[in-house]
Every structure is written in C-alpha cells, then in structure tokens.
UniProtKB/Swiss-Prot annotation:
Belongs to the class I-like SAM-binding methyltransferase superfamily. TPMT family. It comes from Shewanella sediminis (strain HAW-EB3). Keywords: Cytoplasm, Methyltransferase, S-adenosyl-L-methionine, Transferase. This is Thiopurine S-methyltransferase. The gene is tpm. Transmembrane segments: none annotated.
Length: 226
C-alpha cells in the first residue's frame, strides 16, 4: 500500500473511510477501558485522518496525539473544527499542534517513541485504532503492529475496531482482519479481550453491492504487555 494511494484518495476526496460523526463504538466502549485514573494521560490515534473521534477524546479531558500521512487531512481537521494551530518540524515529520491536540503529519514509520514521550506531551496511557489496522494489506499489517507496540509504553490500554469478511469477495481497503489473525499476531504484544462482534452487512451498501456474503465488526480491548 503505497503512500500515493492515500494521497490520491484525499486529493480526489474519495474518503468513504471518513465518518462525519463520532464513531458510536467509541462512545459505547471507551468507558469500558476503565481509564478513570488516566485522565491526565495522552491518547495515541494512528492514521487518524480528520476524524471527529479526536474531538470526542479531547472533550473527555485527554491530550490526543495523532499521526496522519496526508497534510490535507490534518489541515482540514483543524480548520473544520475552528482550531488555531502551530506547526514545527520533528525529524522527518511536521507537527500540527493546538492546546489539547497534536498531529504528526508524515509516515507513521518515521515517528519515534522519543517524540511521543517528549516533555511537550503527557505520558501516553491509551490508544485508539478504528481505521489503522484495517488499512494495511496483510503483508504490511505485522509491521504496523510492531511499530504500534514500539511507540506506546507498557500497560497502555487501547480500543481496536476491525472488520472481517471474505477477502476474496472485495479488494480492500478496508482489509479483512479476523479474530484468529488478531490472536496469532497481536497477542505477543498485547493482552487481548474481545468486547463485541456484530453483523454489520446491512449497514454497508458498498459490501452489499459487491455481493460480499457477510461482514462483521469487532471491538477489542488491548493492553500493551511489559
């Protein structure tokens, strides 16, 4: 999955992956992470786009740190939410920042643990992945998991949302990620608890049009081992 693919999507505004409201699963399950003692910590949101989920997390009192490849997406997040921001260079990335939200724009694999743990940020205690893991084809997905594990401290608690369907029925993204894949490839780094798995085919016309026979959406609670 080359960067040009995602830049093209944003350039042409083919951003069906973007949701114009806060994700209902975030609203429902974020309290299940039991983060009452982590109000003063940061939440890391990889491949964040311009998601309104960031605003929801910030309104809960969290500092939110995102990472997004496309500069247009980051600019749109701040302008569409009427947020003034400053910019600075951090290594190979550009950092957009306002009081409670920072987004590192550039390649996730160029983001360092040191940048996230600098004195400018609160300690990361949580993370949220709704559209990152499922954005990677299987041959790149494990590299992403290892990078995520390297970026966040031990004991960090995360909410992960995935989709699963017969991959041969539809060319991703979003790519199919099964529960078996999660357990085989993420359990080394994270304690994994599945919170829900629901049939969502009727809510996704694209999948129906392509005659995908079934589609499930799962929610996981993860805890970074260590």
């Amino acid at each position: 999955m080359e960067p040009g693919f995602w830049h093209s999507k944003w350039d042409t505004q083919q951003i069906g992956f973007h949701q114009n409201e806060v994700n209902p699963l975030l609203i429902k399950y974020w309290p299940r992470l039991n983060l009452n003692n982590l109000v003063n910590t940061s939440v890391f949101v990889p491949l964040c786009g311009k998601t309104l989920d960031i605003c929801f997390l910030a309104e809960l009192g969290h500092e939110v740190i995102g990472c997004e490849l496309n500069e247009t997406a980051v600019e749109h997040f701040f302008t569409e939410n009427d947020l003034s921001y400053s910019t600075s260079r951090v290594g190979e990335l550009q950092k957009f920042a306002t009081e409670q939200v920072s987004i590192y724009q550039g390649d996730l694999f160029s983001l360092s643990h040191e940048a996230l743990s600098s004195q400018e940020h609160r300690t990361i205690g949580a993370f949220y992945d709704r559209a990152a893991l499922i954005a990677w084809p299987e041959e790149m997905r494990q590299d992403y998991v290892q990078k995520l594990a390297a970026l966040i401290p031990p004991k960090s608690i995360g909410l992960l949302v995935t989709l699963d369907y017969p991959q041969e029925a539809l060319k991703g993204p979003p790519f199919a990620v099964s529960n078996d894949w999660i357990m085989a490839n993420m359990a080394e780094f994270f304690e994994v608890e599945i919170l829900s798995c629901e049939d969502v085919l009727s809510e996704n016309p694209r999948f129906i049009k392509k005659e995908v026979p079934w589609l499930t959406e799962s929610v996981y609670r993860l805890i970074r081992r260590g």
